[in-house]
Curated annotation (Swiss-Prot):
The gene is rhlB. Residues 396-421 are annotated as: Disordered. This is ATP-dependent RNA helicase RhlB. DEAD-box RNA helicase involved in RNA degradation. Has RNA-dependent ATPase activity and unwinds double-stranded RNA. It comes from Klebsiella pneumoniae subsp. pneumoniae (strain ATCC 700721 / MGH 78578). Belongs to the DEAD box helicase family. RhlB subfamily. ATP binds at A53, Q54, T55, G56, T57, G58, K59, T60. GO terms for biological process: RNA catabolic process. PROSITE patterns: DEAD_ATP_HELICASE (PS00039), HELICASE_ATP_BIND_1 (PS51192), HELICASE_CTER (PS51194), Q_MOTIF (PS51195).
Length: 421
């Protein structure tokens, strides 16, 4: 893999449909990332692809470009009905489905192909109204897709392109039976273009590719190191009593443009949110207990820059592409080594640099040896002066008194406490 994020390969070098090239160039996409440069020559020949790549390497645009080109270059199945989409893109989470849909919209506007979105939690009738008007490309989560299929709101008999994104995550979340249910209602694999992407091409993912794809070509983009060479990693050893004050002091010193703070439990996340919101930070909370509409709103606010900090459990650690995240704080070291990689992979994306700061407290420091073995290197340790930690901190807010994402807006350093570093 090249040390630069982009390759010398240009999208315009491929025999892509002119409308697709126009849409890509309008969005500023000229050169391919490594996964795009490997996958597109195969998909443009109509060959199935199973791809392994880190998140943030451009795999979404790889399968969207392939999907739009294929549909524009091949006629729809004869006698296709209005409830029959031509392409199906399956994602493990609602947030990822929404994100893929947003990434696809510029291509849809340029090509005239219609998009549909289907995910659980809310919006059943709103989503259905779009489907009833007919869509070419349907993006969704498996549960809602099956619901619509059982009600005959959609029929998969005219599918020409299938994409399975975050396949390993599908297994982790127990969706594999749903995936197979949907595949059984499509035309045979030999009559479709099939694409699968995954952070890892494990045995079970390869088994799925063998089962549901047509002699898939495997393409892999291995990072130079699991954590990405553009991410500065840093580790502190705080006591449990000093942990929160250290986090707040680091936030004052670093003053990140956009940061995600990860913790291992929803209760810990709620506690962190309460401390940061009370201290005047523009902070949002993202856990499994947050209602779907609110989760999407918080993600939109964070992406727009209306929120500076997102406190999250690992529900947000995979699949979400939030641009320009400058810092990731591991308030708790994760129990799963892979979660460490996925967490800090929120920063340092698409060629940008990033900063990851981890707190190895008394409770979770035991997780560190396994993490360092997994990533293949020791995380550099930094020391702090306990006497220099912030002390004039307000009482934390409680969720019953304030809603996540609605903390006081931060127009400058709270009470002029910005540190010189």
């Amino acid at each position: 893999m090249s040390k630069t994020h982009l390759t010398e390969q240009k999208f315009s070098d491929f025999a892509l449909h002119p409308a697709v090239i126009e849409a890509l160039e309008k969005k500023g996409f000229h050169n391919c990332t490594p996964i795009q440069a490997l996958a597109l020559p195969l998909t443009l020949e109509g060959r199935d692809v199973a791809g392994q790549a880190q998140t943030g390497t451009g795999k979404t645009m790889a399968f969207l470009t392939s999907t739009f080109h294929y549909l524009l270059s091949h006629p729809a199945i004869a006698d296709r009905q209005v409830n029959q989409p031509r392409a199906l893109i399956m994602a493990p989470t609602r947030e990822l489905a929404v994100q893929i849909h947003a990434d696809a919209e510029p291509l849809a506007q340029a090509t005239g192909l219609k998009l549909g979105l289907a995910y659980g939690g809310d919006g059943y009738d709103k989503q259905l109204k779009v489907l009833e008007s007919g869509v070419d490309i349907l993006i969704g989560t498996t549960g809602r897709l099956i619901d619509y299929a059982k009600q005959n709101h959609i029929n998969l008999g005219a599918i020409q392109v299938v994409v399975l994104d975050e396949a390993d995550r599908m297994y982790d979340l127990g969706f594999i039976k749903d995936i197979r249910w949907l595949f059984r209602r499509m035309p045979p694999a030999t009559q479709r273009l099939n694409m699968l992407f995954s952070a890892t091409l494990s045995y079970r993912v390869r088994e799925l590719a063998f089962e549901q794809m047509n002699n898939a070509e495997y393409v892999e983009v291995e990072p130079e190191q699991k954590t990405g060479h553009r991410i500065k990693e840093e580790l502190f050893y705080p006591s449990n009593e000093e942990k929160m004050r250290l986090l707040q002091t680091l936030l004052e010193e670093e003053w990140p443009d956009r940061a995600i703070v990860f913790a291992n439990t929803k209760h810990r996340c709620e506690d962190i949110w309460g401390h940061l919101a009370a201290d005047g930070h523009r902070v949002g909370l993202l856990t499994g207990d947050v209602a779907q509409k609110k989760r999407l709103r918080i993600l939109e606010e964070f992406t727009r820059g209306d929120l500076d900090i997102l406190v999250a459990t690992d529900v947000a650690a995979r699949g979400l592409h939030i641009p320009a995240v400058t810092h990731v704080f591991n308030y708790d070291l994760p129990d799963d080594c892979e979660d460490y990689v996925h967490r800090i992979g929120r920063t340092g994306r698409a060629g940008a640099s990033g900063h990851s700061i981890s707190l190895a407290c008394e409770e979770y420091a035991l997780n560190l040896p396994a993490i360092e073995t997994y990533i293949g290197h020791s995380i550099p340790v930094s020391k702090y002066n306990p006497d220099a930690l912030m002390t004039d901190l307000p009482k934390p807010l409680r969720l019953t008194r304030a809603r996540p994402g609605n903390g006081p807006r931060r127009n400058g350093p709270p009470r002029n406490r910005r540190r010189s570093g």
